[in-house]
Amino acid sequence: MVEQVETWKFIEDTERTNPPINLKSSFTHFLFVSLMDESDLYRRWMRLVENLEREGIIKSERVKRAFLQVPRYKFVSDRYKEYAHVDEPLPIPAGQTISAPHMVAIMLELAELEDGMNVLEVGAGSGWNAALIYELIKRKVYTIERASDLVEFARKNLERAGYKDKVHVIWGDGTKGFPPNAPYDRIIVTAGAPKVPQPLIEQLKVGGKLLIPVGSYHLWQELLEVIKLDEDNKIKIKNHGGVAFVPLIGDHGWRE
């Protein structure tokens, strides 16, 4: 049962599944990347974080600190590292993307994460968002991913970045949630669904919050904040405006 729907601001900058970046494949490109050391990459990353804060996208010191602790270049393949500071999605395996930094920041600010919260992420992707979540809750994060290639990609990235024992990557259908670790204070979904999956509502604590894009299969959804009001799964929905994510595939999402 839905109590009410509130419309919030429209998010103008949305996710794009095919980022318009001119990726060079020549020898000079690889030579350039190899000559860049981590300090160069981190300086670029710091400038992006400062820009997101200046634009009012990063609002809290906690989210800013997490972004500075977990730079995106640690979660992309070598050929994309020099683009990690660009505020656009980047390709990752299985035809998916790592989200644009502004979109990740928007969702983390809306999540209002606190130390000790129990959080499930649906759509592990590269592992970057899960690492950010860990820095905001300081408790093991559970993230579920249906694409086996991405499960391995996320696990390797997380291990290299020092999060092997801090994030548990599960291979499975995220639209079913992960009952063994429920109930959750927060569930964050990083793909677009046709509707809010009922199992995710059921696995929230009363007062818990679910963030999920809901709408069409490609290119247009609305970012919904779903708050569970009671044990009968009565919910309140806030609409945070237009976004565009890859489709959420599963029994309670889109069919392949």
Model-derived features: where do they sit?
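Conserved nucleotide-cofactor-binding alpha/beta core module
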Residues: 112-236
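Class I SAM-dependent transferase core
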Residues: 35-120, 128-132, 136, 150-161, ...
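Substrate-binding/catalytic lobe of Class I Rossmann-like enzymes that use SAM or dcSAM, i.e.
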Residues: 222-256
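Short hydrophobic targeting helices and cationic amphipathic motifs
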Residues: 19, 23, 30-31
